[in-house]
Amino acid sequence: MTNIRKSHPLMKIVNNAFIDLPAPSNISSWWNFGSLLGICLILQILTGLFLAMHYTSDTMTAFSSVTHICRDVNYGWIIRYMHANGASMFFICLFMHVGRGLYYGSYTFLETWNIGVILLFVTMATAFMGYVLPWGQMSFWGATVITNLLSAIPYIGTNLVEWIWGGFSVDKATLTRFFAFHFILPFIIAALAMVHLLFLHETGSNNPTGISSDADKIPFHPYYTIKDILGAILLILVLTLLVLFAPDLLGDPDNYTPANPLNTPPHIKPEWYFLFAYAILRSIPNKLGGVLALILSILILILMPMLHTSKQRSMMFRPISQCLFWVLVADLLTLTWIGGQPVEHPYIIIGQLASIMYFLLILVLMPVAGSIENNLLKW
C-alpha cells in the first residue's frame, strides 16, 4: 500500500511542496524569509479577523471602536498591537527577502520574481489602507496626501481622486471602501503567494553560489522544516518583545489624536516601511515627476533581470558588485531616515542626492560593475 501523503490528491500537493521537495543542501538563513512571510501573513489574517469583529468603519465611531478594542475587549490590546507590529515584521521580512533575491541573483527566475514584485505592490497597498482605518490624525492626513497624488495624472487626475474618495474629500465613503479592500486583499496576497510558490517549484530554489544544485539535493523535511521552525521562533520572539515592551515604538503619536480635517499635523509621514519611497517622492519638486519616481522606485525591480550583465548569477564571488549592493542598502537606510525628517535644509539636499544615488546604482553602476567583473575573469 502506498503512503497516504503520496497518494491522496491534497496530501500529494503538500508533500511535494513541504516534505519531499528536493532542496539545495547549501541554502543559508537568507532563505528562511519566505516561510517567515507565510507565517506573518497567517498571523495578520487571524489578528485582522478578530479586530474586524469589533471594528466599525464609520468616521464617527472608527477611532472609538479601536479604543474600545484596546480597553474593553478581552486581550484586545494584544491583538491590536500584534496586528500593527506584525505589519512591521512583515515588511522587515519582505525587504530581507527582496534583498536576498537581489544579492544572489534569484531574479533570473522571471515568473517567480515578477509575481514577487506584484506581491510587494499589493502588500504595500494593503498596509497603506490598513493605516487609514484607526482614523487618527496621521491616518486621515496620510490618506489625503497619498490619494491626492493621483491628481497629478493629466486630464483624468481630479476625477480619479474624487472617484477613489467617493466624494470631494476623504470621508465616510473612503473609510468604508478602504476597510472593504483591506479585508479582501490579504486573501488575494495568499492566492498570489501560492502562485509564487508554484513557479518557484517549477525551477527549484536558487542557492548562495548561483550554480545549479541538481547534483546535490536534500529533502525539505526534516532539514529545512526544523530550520524554518527556528526562524519562526525567533520571529515570534522579536514580535512578542515588540508588542509587550514597546508597542508604539514604530507608530506615530499623532495617530492617538482623532482625525480632524481642520487641523493639519506639522509633519505628515507614513509608517517607517514607506519612508524610503516617500523620501524619493518628496525629493522631486514637480508633482507628476515625484509620483513617477515613487512608482519607479519599486517598479525598477522588474527591470533587474534585464540589467544583469554578469556571467555569474550570484554576487558571492563578485566583490565590486558586493560593495555596490551594500552601498545600495546604506542608501535605502538614508532615504528611510530622510523620509521621517521635516522638509528643510540640509534634509532636502540629502534626500535628493540619496534618490539620485538609488537610481544611479541600480540602472548604471551595478550593470557596469557586472561587465567589469566579466573582463576581470579573463585575466
Curated annotation (Swiss-Prot):
Q: How is the cofactor bound?
A: Binds 2 heme b groups non-covalently.
Q: What is its main location?
A: mitochondrion
- In Gene Ontology terms, what is a biological process of this protein? mitochondrial electron transport, ubiquinol to cytochrome c
Q: Which residues bind heme b b562?
A: 83, 182
Gene Ontology cellular component terms for the protein in this record: mitochondrial inner membrane; respiratory chain complex III
Miscellaneous note of the record: Heme 1 (or BL or b562) is low-potential and absorbs at about 562 nm, and heme 2 (or BH or b566) is high-potential and absorbs at about 566 nm.
Q: How does it assemble?
A: The cytochrome bc1 complex contains 11 subunits: 3 respiratory subunits (MT-CYB, CYC1 and UQCRFS1), 2 core proteins (UQCRC1 and UQCRC2) and 6 low-molecular weight proteins (UQCRH/QCR6, UQCRB/QCR7, UQCRQ/QCR8, UQCR10/QCR9, UQCR11/QCR10 and a cleavage product of UQCRFS1). This cytochrome bc1 complex then forms a dimer.
**What name is this protein filed under?**
Cytochrome b
Q: Which organism is it from?
A: Neotragus moschatus
User: Corresponding gene?
Assistant: MT-CYB
